[in-house]
């Protein structure tokens, strides 16, 4: 087995370092797994990951979000709570963020080169502004509002 030193490997190593420096384990783990895949016999699975990775990730994320409801740690509100203005606002924000995410998936599909900038921006926001890595999909969706074309 010989290691491949190319621009993609360099990008992945850079993302790993930024993830470590920015205390962003999601970026660190993801870039490490992809680097290991690229450098080993697992490279044959990269097309599968490319094709289905976002959908699988969204499924896992949805399971994580719904788990506290299923476990009983988060109680469902009664019907009267659903008509409170804060609940309406929460639902509206949820719809807006889901829409941003959809636009983000489209933008990343049509302009994948922007993903690096989105990741670096997310890492910088976590490292220096006390932010939380909520995800490149939402960032890409917001970016699509500024640059247009989503596919």
Swiss-Prot record:
UniProt xrefs under Pfam families: DUF441
InterPro entries linked: UPF0756_TM
Parts of the chain that traverse the membrane: 1-21, 52-72, 81-101, 123-143
Gene Ontology, cellular component aspect: plasma membrane
Membrane topology annotation: Multi-pass membrane protein
Top-level division of the source organism's lineage: Bacteria
Principal place of residence: membrane
KW Transmembrane helix (keyword) present: yes
Protein keywords: Cell membrane, Membrane, Transmembrane, Transmembrane helix
Subcellular locations according to the entry: Cell membrane
Family as reported in the entry's similarity comment: Belongs to the UPF0756 family.
HAMAP family: UPF0756
Protein name listed in UniProt: UPF0756 membrane protein HS_0993
Organism, as annotated: Histophilus somni (strain 129Pt)
